[in-house]
């Protein structure tokens, strides 16, 4: 805290945490979320043939984190849909991205410098949602650390965690794309951020919430803008995980097990090959015996 005061970041962080998200930041969040929906294979054809299904997918991209958080806390799943302003704004963005003449709106928001601004503003919303989700969970479960972490995590990455449900709405089933099995950078960052905000909420992290929001937002904005600008799908956590995971969890490689062939010795032929070889040897022995009898 002394360092933050010396750098005069305390007042800046407090002012930043009080900036309202609606409508500018929420608009950016909706634009980027529905852009990612349009990138999905078959999304454009779905919007032409089944516009209601396409709209539902867009709403899930925009509000999936709220739905999943309400599910965890036992609250009505459609509670957030009572916010008419947000629903209408997200619906307008969906219509412009998919149905604007000549794709003018889509081309404008996809222009890289403009898109980077929207991506940065979306990360501001993501971090604020994590902080609000943990505060909400703390109100119900004062000592439920894991509940607070889970709620903050889904508030930050609920859309990705519900990707399989969204795929079903589009008539696609890809269980191998489960986000928990293959976490993207935003999902991992939301989890780590949820842990940090939980420690701050329970007073184990000696920093104000406004300062933590500001610092973590700057980290998320910098990383996501860089990854988007370079069209990279890697994660800044990969280097750290490459050192930590083998120590804590082992190599995690399925090919390192010595008995992957159900009991066969490593380096030896598979059991099917051994069985085939044995049959060939028996057949050869029988043939030799018959030859001797004939002689």
UniProtKB/Swiss-Prot annotation:
Residues given in the record as a 1,2-diacyl-sn-glycero-3-phospho-(1D-myo-inositol-4,5-bisphosphate) binding sites: 122, 126
GO cellular component terms, semicolon-separated: nuclear membrane; sarcoplasmic reticulum membrane
Activity regulation: Channel activity is activated by a change of voltage within the sarcoplasmic reticulum lumen and blocked by luminal high Ca(2+) levels.
Lumenal compartment segments: 1-18, 73-85, 166-178, 231-234
GO biological process: regulation of release of sequestered calcium ion into cytosol
InterPro entries tied to this protein: TRIC_channel
Location (main, coarse): membrane
Subcellular localization(s) per the UniProt record: Sarcoplasmic reticulum membrane; Nucleus membrane
Basic and acidic residues: compositionally biased ranges: 277-286
Lipid bilayer topology: Multi-pass membrane protein
Chain positions covered by the region annotation Disordered: 256-295
Record's catalysed reaction(s): K(+)(in) = K(+)(out)
Binding-site positions, Ca(2+): 74
Family the UniProt entry places it in: Belongs to the TMEM38 family.
Function noted in UniProt: Intracellular monovalent cation channel required for maintenance of rapid intracellular calcium release. Acts as a potassium counter-ion channel that functions in synchronization with calcium release from intracellular stores. Opened by a change of voltage within the sarcoplasmic reticulum lumen.
Protein name per Swiss-Prot or TrEMBL: Trimeric intracellular cation channel type A
Classification of source organism: Eukaryota, Metazoa, Chordata, Craniata, Vertebrata
Gene: TMEM38A
């Amino acid at each position: 805290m002394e360092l933050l005061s010396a750098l005069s970041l305390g007042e800046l962080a407090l002012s930043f945490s009080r900036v309202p998200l609606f409508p500018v930041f929420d608009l950016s969040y909706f634009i980027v979320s529905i852009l990612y929906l349009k990138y999905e294979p078959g999304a454009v054809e779905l919007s032409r043939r089944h516009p209601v299904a396409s709209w539902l997918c867009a709403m899930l991209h925009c509000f999936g984190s709220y739905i999943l958080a309400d599910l965890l806390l036992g609250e009505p799943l459609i509670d957030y849909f009572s916010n008419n302003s947000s629903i209408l704004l997200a619906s307008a963005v969906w219509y412009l991205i998919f149905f604007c003449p000549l794709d003018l709106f889509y081309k404008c928001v996809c222009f890289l410098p403009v898109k980077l601004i929207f991506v940065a503003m979306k990360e501001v919303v993501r971090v604020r949602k994590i902080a609000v989700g943990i505060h909400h969970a703390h109100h119900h479960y004062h000592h439920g650390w894991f509940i607070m972490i889970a709620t903050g995590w889904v508030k930050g990455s609920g859309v990705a965690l519900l990707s399989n449900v969204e795929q079903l709405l589009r008539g696609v089933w890809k269980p191998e794309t489960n986000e928990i099995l293959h976490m993207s950078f935003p999902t991992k960052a939301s989890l780590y951020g949820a842990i940090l905000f939980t420690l701050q909420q329970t007073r184990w992290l000696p920093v104000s919430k406004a300062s933590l929001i500001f610092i973590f937002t700057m980290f998320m904005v910098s990383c996501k803008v860089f990854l988007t600008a370079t069209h990279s799908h890697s994660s800044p956590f990969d280097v750290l995980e490459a050192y930590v995971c083998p120590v804590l969890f082992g190599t995690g490689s399925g090919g390192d097990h010595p008995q992957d062939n159900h009991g066969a010795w490593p380096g030896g032929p598979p059991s099917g090959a051994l069985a085939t070889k044995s049959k060939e040897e028996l057949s050869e022995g029988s043939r030799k015996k018959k030859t001797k009898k004939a002689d």
